[in-house]
Amino acid sequence: MSRKLSDKEIDEKFEHLLSKGWSFSEDKIYIQKTFVFKNFKEAFSWMCRIAFIAEEINHHPNWANVFKTVDISLSTHDAGGLTELDLNFANKVELET
């Protein structure tokens, strides 16, 4: 199981993601972002690519898709907050976008 990061670690390690449109929940339990695509097909194709990454690293997002918009949030439930797994996953998501 991954260790929950401290607020200081979260601020340092996730800083670059904030400039890319990610935001924290008020309690810093999860990080979230909304992605908007050209159409549903592009949104769903992107979700499929992300699903393969999730399976590869065995870490799965909470997400919702409405037409061309995908809302994604990341948290490590077993740890009760953000961990290195969430940081790595968010970085991989950014590479696919």
Region annotations inferred by a language model:
Residues M1-T97:
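Charge-rich alpha-helical segments
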